From Swiss-Prot:
Compartments, as annotated in UniProt: Cell membrane
Organism lineage string: Eukaryota, Metazoa, Chordata, Craniata, Vertebrata
Function as written in the Swiss-Prot or TrEMBL entry: May regulate monocyte chemotaxis and thymic cell line apoptosis. Alternative coreceptor with CD4 for HIV-1 infection.
Full protein name: C-C chemokine receptor type 8
InterPro entries, per database record: CCR1-9-like, Chemokine_CCR8, Chemokine_rcpt, GPCR_Rhodpsn, GPCR_Rhodpsn_7TM
Organism: Homo sapiens (Human)
Residue numbers on the Extracellular membrane side: 1-35, 94-107, 172-202, 264-280
Membrane topology category: Multi-pass membrane protein
PANTHER family hit by this protein: C-C CHEMOKINE RECEPTOR TYPE 8, CELL ADHESION MOLECULE
Ranges facing Cytoplasmic side: 64-73, 130-146, 223-238, 305-355
Amino acid sequence: MDYTLDLSVTTVTDYYYPDIFSSPCDAELIQTNGKLLLAVFYCLLFVFSLLGNSLVILVLVVCKKLRSITDVYLLNLALSDLLFVFSFPFQTYYLLDQWVFGTVMCKVVSGFYYIGFYSSMFFITLMSVDRYLAVVHAVYALKVRTIRMGTTLCLAVWLTAIMATIPLLVFYQVASEDGVLQCYSFYNQQTLKWKIFTNFKMNILGLLIPFTIFMFCYIKILHQLKRCQNHNKTKAIRLVLIVVIASLLFWVPFNVVLFLTSLHSMHILDGCSISQQLTYATHVTEIISFTHCCVNPVIYAFVGEKFKKHLSEIFQKSCSQIFNYLGRQMPRESCEKSSSCQQHSSRSSSVDYIL
């Protein structure tokens, strides 16, 4: 599997092929102990992401009941992270053994990765544009920032992410290399240019276009806030801005390495040492990018005031139900605290626009 050249969902590969006509350049980087540690890391990411994003969905659906367009975007962003992380169990098994799930699942699991990648960046872009409209064009935003509009845009994002992913999956297959079944994307002499195009497409759709929109939106927002000095609007964009910055920090390094890999495929960068360095850089930056799927819930917990209150409310209700099931009465102090949290949350709803 040509892992460095192809953004695959798997990391078991031991060799990097700088050219389809040359012999492989030995770039074995992950030894047995390293694979075990990496597998444990993926398992931890899976657990924390599954738990964190499930709590986000629970808060948005049960507590906030999707009352705003931003709630819709945050819900879909959490679903995108969950879709991304669903590839981890397959990836972990593949890392430790071989691909035993067949060609169809090879394409499906790889699709989870790509769709999760594209949709995550697209939803963050939508949230940035939404903040821009809410702050800079507040009157116009009242007309267009509706639940129906948000749902329609989210459906468009999912469709775009799927359409961007489907051409990539055509080349994925399962083949045996040295007696080990591997899931990888195969490119021959005729399709090698398509592979390079795919890498550049990911750079453009996954980083360049979103980053350009981010810069435009937040420059305009900061200019507007500087003029108006509106504290409520400043609070309203803080969470989204932190999510955007975090996503860029996790994904920019990988996109840079992907771009350099494309240059290597075109022989602009050449040499065995370059290929080994790119292989190593891909592994490292991919691990960094994978971590993004469990970061957003942590940001909400530390930055989102209402998110913490809603979690406290859910915890109190759950404890109350457990006490009732056991035939006991919940301590009065906890009930009063839960009631106080609910009242305070309702009073602050007019101030905080998002989690």
